[in-house]
């Protein structure tokens, strides 16, 4: 069974997310643990957490298919000490919010070194992750591949491996693969050889069991453009045929697919339908 969903709004409460996910045709989701554009975050109440867990069970959503995404302001690679410290403290709080809700995975962008260089940036990321992981429990941090721009660290999967190799609690660090970011950085998943190379790289660097989520996004710009502009499924440069190639791999089918495409719930429902239309149109076998 394909595990698919979208990044869902929390404006009406955490407890609305499971039902809203089912309403758009999904069985998986990603949420922000708080206002993504704020340094402020607070733990949900016991009542809110209980209601959320009840709705998860009621709507039949597996906890392995539920994810949080860290806030936009966090930058563990920042050379600015105040920003780095605030990032560490907010990430700790996000881990605690995940624990309270019962969510096992927290996705993060590794960060931007802001011109100070990859090595220094990775050192700061590792120090930040160690500070977070050594002072929290349970939740697994997912390192997401990012677009190659603005000093971003993680546009190459080997950069994510460098980070994970240096972290104390490696068992609490896994990965997310974003199709738009990867395409933006030269990973061509529109061809069978490209997907095979990607899977081989993930297996070699991390082990495929460490790939916990796929951010399923088309790209508004061509291969290697380094623009980081998501597009709706089938409407970008990956396109229907490209996604058909990607979807045909069993290793890809085993991982939850989370849409971060333009629009809200209505558009995400349409994109989920589009995914299944592509699967049917190209005769892709699904277990």
UniProtKB/Swiss-Prot annotation:
Query: What reaction does this catalyse?
Result: Endonucleolytic cleavage to 5'-phosphooligonucleotide end-products
Q: What is the gene name?
A: nfo
**Which PROSITE patterns does this entry report, sorted A to Z?**
AP_NUCLEASE_F2_1, AP_NUCLEASE_F2_2, AP_NUCLEASE_F2_3, AP_NUCLEASE_F2_4
Q: What EC numbers are recorded for this enzyme?
A: 3.1.21.2
The annotation note on the cofactor reads:
Binds 3 Zn(2+) ions.
Which cofactor does this sequence's record say it needs? Zn(2+)
Q: Give binding positions for Zn(2+) 2.
A: 144, 178, 215, 260
Q: Which organism is it from?
A: Thermotoga sp. (strain RQ2)
Say which enzyme class the record assigns: hydrolase
- Please indicate which superkingdom the organism of origin belongs to: Bacteria
Binding positions for Zn(2+) 1? Answer: 69, 109, 144
BP terms from Gene Ontology? base-excision repair
Q: Name one GO molecular function term.
A: DNA-(apurinic or apyrimidinic site) endonuclease activity
- Protein name (database record): Probable endonuclease 4
